[in-house]
């Protein structure tokens, strides 16, 4: 069930924070070409057993931009504490679909969504639903790191202060420290919490954004190409973090990297021209796909 959080308009009063920023609220496999398919080393990247508790579900979801249909009636169930990867060629609708899961498409005037999206069996498109609360419960990490123009501490503390999650400054300090620990960043920044978050490296900034998301106690974390702007070392740290976070959160990640999907996800969903073509365990999708379109994509024949 969704927790009660006090909401205010204080974010809107801070003109130094952009509108997009306000929407926030390991062991590697060798995944490479081998013949026609991507090899999938289950020994080096064991996948956890995903419990069949449905956290998010969509039913006949369509998304329109004006008269153009971007998502064509998708049904999908996302399980609690799983990592599910959305893959597909550019323009296939995977990011658009991801944004329906916490109503980020509401910010686009020409966008219209039909169908049902349920979080713990509650319709998130119910007109009486508090969207600010929803976006705290279903957090978003964007493609480009977008720290607030504030200190490292204030970046993480901003959400808890906004939502009234800390009783006093000691509570707030504990939330900030715990969130930075969970994001794998505490040891790197604990002695410079008052320095600007924008002064961190790209990989550190992305982990700071993840800490900021964690700080408001989400149940689901959506990630839209979170590593596309990062170097390989920073990418490896974020991927390891995803694995650790999945013990506490449900994670959906959009990625153009099939190798990344193979490394981090329990299940993979393949999108093509607004349709959900196939969803199955990541191992099966990459080694024995059911659909010819999936096979063509993962073997590099298009996309």
UniProtKB/Swiss-Prot annotation:
SUPFAM superfamilies, A to Z: P-loop containing nucleoside triphosphate hydrolases
Cell compartment(s), UniProt: Cell inner membrane
UniProt keyword list: ATP-binding, Cell inner membrane, Cell membrane, Membrane, Nucleotide-binding, Phosphate transport, Translocase, Transport
Organism: Acinetobacter baylyi (strain ATCC 33305 / BD413 / ADP1)
Residues that bind ATP: 88-95
Protein's membrane topology: Peripheral membrane protein
ABC transporter domain mapped to chain residues: 56-298
Family in the record: Belongs to the ABC transporter superfamily. Phosphate importer (TC 3.A.1.7) family.
Coiled coil location: none
GO cellular component: plasma membrane
Function, as annotated: Part of the ABC transporter complex PstSACB involved in phosphate import. Responsible for energy coupling to the transport system.
Gene: pstB
EC number: 7.3.2.1
Complexes and interactors: The complex is composed of two ATP-binding proteins (PstB), two transmembrane proteins (PstC and PstA) and a solute-binding protein (PstS).
GO MF, one annotated term: ATP binding
GO biological process: phosphate ion transmembrane transport
PROSITE patterns noted in UniProt: ABC_TRANSPORTER_1, ABC_TRANSPORTER_2, PSTB
Protein name, as recorded: Phosphate import ATP-binding protein PstB
Family annotation (InterPro entries): AAA+_ATPase, ABC_transporter-like_ATP-bd, ABC_transporter-like_CS, P-loop_NTPase, PstB-like
């Amino acid at each position: 069930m969704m927790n009660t959080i006090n909401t205010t308009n204080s974010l809107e009063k801070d003109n130094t924070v952009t509108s997009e920023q306000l929407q926030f609220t390991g062991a590697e496999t060798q995944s490479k070409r081998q013949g026609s398919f991507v090899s999938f080393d289950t020994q080096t990247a064991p996948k956890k057993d995903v419990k069949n508790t449905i956290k998010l579900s969509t039913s006949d979801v369509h998304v329109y931009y004006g008269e153009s249909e971007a998502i064509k009636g998708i049904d999908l169930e996302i399980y609690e504490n799983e990592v599910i990867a959305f893959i597909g060629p550019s323009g296939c609708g995977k990011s658009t679909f991801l944004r329906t899961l916490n109503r980020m498409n509401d910010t686009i005037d020409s966008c219209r969504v039909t169908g049902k999206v349920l979080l713990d069996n509650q319709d998130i498109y119910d007109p009486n639903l508090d969207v600010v609360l929803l976006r705290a419960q279903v957090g978003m990490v964007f493609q480009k790191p977008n720290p607030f123009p504030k200190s490292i501490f204030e970046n993480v503390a901003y959400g808890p202060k906004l939502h009234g999650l800390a009783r006093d400054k000691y509570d707030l300090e504990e939330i900030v420290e715990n969130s930075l620990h969970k994001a794998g960043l505490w040891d790197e920044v604990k002695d410079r919490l008052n320095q600007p978050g924008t002064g961190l490296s790209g990989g550190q900034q992305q982990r700071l954004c993840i800490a900021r998301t964690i700080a408001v106690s989400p149940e689901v974390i959506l990630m839209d190409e979170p590593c596309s702007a990062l170097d390989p070392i920073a990418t490896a740290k974020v991927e390891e973090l995803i694995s650790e976070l999945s013990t506490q959160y449900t994670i959906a990640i959009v990625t153009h990297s099939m190798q990344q999907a193979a490394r981090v996800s329990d299940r993979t969903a393949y999108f093509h021209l607004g349709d959900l073509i196939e969803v199955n365990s990541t191992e099966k999708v990459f080694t024995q796909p059911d659909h010819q379109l999936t096979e063509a994509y993962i073997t590099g024949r298009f996309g």
